[in-house]
């Protein structure tokens, strides 16, 4: 299992619109091969910051399967306009 972690900085004032768009986008990612689960958490100190955690069966399920898919283009169209700057995405595994 691989855990994807993305720190999302949302343009200030667009937080609610982002959350609504994320609810629309969630079924896209949850239907992908290798997807296990995800969570989106809002920072309490900086309300324009969110932490997205996604669990995948393999790294390639995310980096090749999801990112190389037409579904990723839908995800991107719904969400990428909210990011400033574009998020750093890292992958972790349990030890």
From Swiss-Prot:
SUPFAM superfamilies to which the protein is assigned, alphabetical: Dimeric alpha+beta barrel
Transmembrane segments: none
Family matches, as Gene3D superfamilies: 3.30.70.100
Domain ABM: residue ranges: 2-92
Protein name (Swiss-Prot/TrEMBL): Uncharacterized protein YczJ
Taxonomic source organism: Bacillus subtilis (strain 168)
Organism phylogeny: Bacteria, Bacillati, Bacillota, Bacilli, Bacillales
